[in-house]
Amino acid sequence: MEPVHYSVQGNNILQIFMENFHKEDPVLFLDGTAGEGGHSLLFLKGFPNSKVILCDRDPVMLSRALARLVDFKERVVSIQTNFSEIDSNLLSSHGINDSPQGILLDLGISTFHLFHSGRGFSFKEAEPLDMRLTPNIGINAEDVINTYSKDRLMHIFYTYGEERWSKKIAEVIVERRKQNLISYTSELADLISKIIPRKLWPPGRHPATRIFQALRIEVNQELTHIEKGLDSLLNLLRPEGVIQVISFHSLEDRIVKNSLRNYAKQNGFELLTKKPILPSEEETKENPASRSAKLRVLRKTKSADKKYKKENSKEE
């Protein structure tokens, strides 16, 4: 089973951990978004005495990651869970009584999900409108498209997709589904491409891209999980530990940026990236999908005296 996902900013991430930990240290890493295990493989090779807690909400991805890391199975503990649910009680139930020193969250959708899962994340194939990252649990994209009100559809298209044609697209979907349910990615993509005039299509991008992003975020409640997960993981992180987070679009990055900056102000944390680290030109040539990846890093300098209290940040 060959991996199909590229480990975005892998060299940068490993280098940052190398700068904060000694190579021979028995570092405990937590990969909160395991994917196909590419980043964890770098940690296991780069730190020969380390262990990795491998987490993913998708059992298919977790299985693929474990297969890739089979040579290191004695140093890997796997947990099927959303990273937002990770806390000391969950780790303890899996025999882990220490807090992680290195945490990684890669918030991007994997290549496997887009092109090989058959769950309708991409409009390039005629697939069922599903989009669930945890299979068979919760509402799917077909439910959203065929049951949400016009106003609710318009809201998620505009809020999560930043789509200026949100109102018109929502209106057409509601009228169209009165005749037949919209069940396949190709149906939805074709419908959207007919609504937006071709001369106004975004350069180099299918006009349905923003709507598909909005649906995926809604189905999986991605932004809610990011907020909750950062709060939990930053409190779980061991003193002198480091958390690295990769975001791919402005909605994700805004949450990550503000959360990390607020922690750095209040709770004995040090922001190691005043500005996000971007992929190298070489990496973007090899993997064009990485071009929008922003890496932000925070180090815990001491234990927080009390649980973090959110405050809104208006800093850029």
From Swiss-Prot:
Its EC number is 2.1.1.199. Keywords: Cytoplasm, Methyltransferase, rRNA processing, S-adenosyl-L-methionine, Transferase. Residues 276-316 are annotated as: Disordered. Residues 302-316 have a biased composition (Basic and acidic residues). It is found in: Cytoplasm. InterPro entries: RsmH (IPR002903), SAM-dep_MeTrfase_MraW_recog (IPR023397), SAM-dependent_MTases_sf (IPR029063). GO terms for molecular function: rRNA (cytosine-N4-)-methyltransferase activity. S-adenosyl-L-methionine binds at G37, G38, H39, D56, F83, D106, H113. One of its GO terms (biological process) is rRNA base methylation. It catalyses: cytidine(1402) in 16S rRNA + S-adenosyl-L-methionine = N(4)-methylcytidine(1402) in 16S rRNA + S-adenosyl-L-homocysteine + H(+). It is an enzyme of class 2 (transferase). Belongs to the methyltransferase superfamily. RsmH family. HAMAP family: 16SrRNA_methyltr_H (MF_01007). Specifically methylates the N4 position of cytidine in position 1402 (C1402) of 16S rRNA. This is Ribosomal RNA small subunit methyltransferase H. The lineage of its organism: Bacteria, Pseudomonadati, Spirochaetota, Spirochaetia, Leptospirales.
